[in-house]
Regions:
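Core catalytic lobe of class I
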Residues: 1-224
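Short, conserved SAM-binding/catalytic segment
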Residues: 226-237
Length: 237
């Protein structure tokens, strides 16, 4: 991939939960790929961000959805800290994604069902106050020139997923992708999802007139993604 190619990334990485889950009714669709040691997981994800530094434009944004799991709840915090300490990326915002349905089912005597997940908005440290967004100016103070913006909050309500039936259960929804694009990406932006899964990010890009690139290791998920994308593109012709 060329340097400075991408306007940004919208993705959700594997959560590293390749275990038999006693509090949930499914695996995440990556049972043969998602079982690294904690150190290996942190290293792999951090190395990915070092590569993102090369391919994402300086003012680009990464919307990174990662939730904790009962097996190792501290893992996302360790990862984001390592990314901040060892790469040129840092957190600009943290968005709370509210879903209509909570998981896992209430079978744990201690753990809460999660109805929200976090989306970390990461930008390059040199652009912490200058990265690109779609925030619209609502008014300007005539005396001082101070700009005031329409109200944008770090709380998004969106469906869990698109309801597509397949082995990959850990997916988000096109509705979520649309709401993130509306905040951070203008029409014609090139958005990458390095963990494409069944193509939800790409479908959201099509819906919002953005270009896209995706990567996917699992052939079954890739085939589903291509089928969904082709069907969506045909409907736009």
């Amino acid at each position: 991939m060329d340097d400075n190619l991408l306007d940004g990334i919208i993705t959700s990485p594997p959560y590293n939960i390749n275990t038999e889950r006693s509090d949930c009714y499914y695996n995440n669709g990556y049972s043969d790929l998602d079982g690294l040691s904690e150190n290996d997981y942190l290293e792999v994800r951090t190395e990915e961000f070092k590569e993102f530094s090369r391919v994402v434009k300086d003012k680009g944004v990464i919307c990174y959805n990662i939730s904790y799991a009962k097996e190792n709840p501290i893992l996302p915090t360790l990862l984001i800290t390592k990314i901040h300490n060892e790469t040129d990326w840092t957190i600009a915002d943290i968005i709370c994604w509210k879903k209509p349905h909570a998981i896992p089912f209430q079978t744990s005597p201690t753990k809460l069902s999660r109805v929200t997940e976090l989306i970390y908005v990461l930008v390059k440290k040199t652009e912490l106050h200058t990265f690109k967004t779609n925030k619209e100016v609502s008014k300007v103070n005539e005396k001082t020139g101070q700009k005031f913006y329409k109200n944008y909050i770090n709380y998004i309500s969106a469906k869990n997923n698109d309801g597509y039936k397949c082995k990959l259960k850990a997916t988000f929804s096109q509705e979520l992708v649309t709401k993130l694009i509306n905040i951070y990406f203008e029409k014609g932006s090139l958005i990458y999802d390095p963990f494409t899964g069944i193509g939800t990010t790409q479908l959201g890009c099509i819906n919002n007139q953005c270009d896209f690139i995706g990567s996917e290791l699992k052939e079954e998920h890739y085939s589903i993604a291509m089928s969904r994308i082709e069907e969506k593109l045909v409907s736009y012709v």
